[in-house]
Amino acid sequence: MSKVLKNALAGYGYNLVALPKEGIAPLLLLYKNKRDVSSSGNNIDKLFALADSPPPIVSKNNATLNLQQNSTVSFDGKAGVDILDWLLQKLKMGKLRGNINADHINSLQISYQNVFEDNVSLLQLDNFISGSEPKVDQFNTFKEKLKDNELFVINSVLKSNSFSVSAQNKNGQNIDLEATIKGIVDADVNVGRSKKDEVLMEYKNATPIVFAFKAQKIIYDHKKWWQFFKKGDAKFRIKDEHGVVLKDESGFPTQSLEETNELINI
């Protein structure tokens, strides 16, 4: 079974995207999928009608100086090689084509470089959701999920178009991947050393892909028994959601654990 061994971003409240890609943005509506979450393919305003306030404006391409040295995710050999191949292809850098044998790798680290954040104001998001009415008649599929607190909305994403990679064998010794990577990436990709044992890959024309996110659980506040004589529906509020993985149904099956110091299965 493939595992995430360590996620440095968890300490900053970020959850992982199983398969980093474009198209993941603040205000995207997610739904519970076993122990993790999946994309509904729609933004939050498709489910909630405008009421007291409009949906918050997305602030894009914000600098993340405190995360530049802390955007590292450590995988076991199989997961690491799979993710490395995925990133190379999504960023149009190249393809492994079996040139790296996962059996020879005990752990592999991906450190995202040139990281930027897109986000929305939590206060504005809370005001929008708490003052809106859901269009449950148009979304029967999500009606019960909304009542059961199984819907989420993204409030922040991290994105990058370059990364570095390092790997170790079963004895804990570093594996030199530079020659192998130089032999498989496209000519336009710059390959160098970010640190002694890390191979850095940069392709300036690559569109950034999202690799981590923050999400808010939408909490349904049921009416109390003494409120049933009042008009109006129950209201909604939001709460930070941690320890989930954003799944792509066409990709790796994932299973997250609540404790950040435990393994996450991918």
From Swiss-Prot:
Keywords associated with the record: Antiviral defense, Cell inner membrane, Cell membrane, Cytoplasm, Membrane, Transmembrane, Transmembrane beta strand
Source organism of this protein record: Gillisia limnaea (strain DSM 15749 / LMG 21470 / R-8282)
Keyword Membrane attached: yes
Segments forming a coiled coil: none
Family the entry assigns: Belongs to the bacterial gasdermin family.
Domain notes: The N-terminus has marked structural similarity to the mammalian gasdermin N-terminal domain. The C-terminal region wraps around the twisted beta sheet core, probably stabilizing the inactive state.
Transmembrane segments: 67-83, 95-113, 162-179, 187-203
GO cellular component: cytoplasm; plasma membrane
GO aspect biological process, one term: defense response to virus
Protein name (Swiss-Prot/TrEMBL): Gasdermin bGSDM
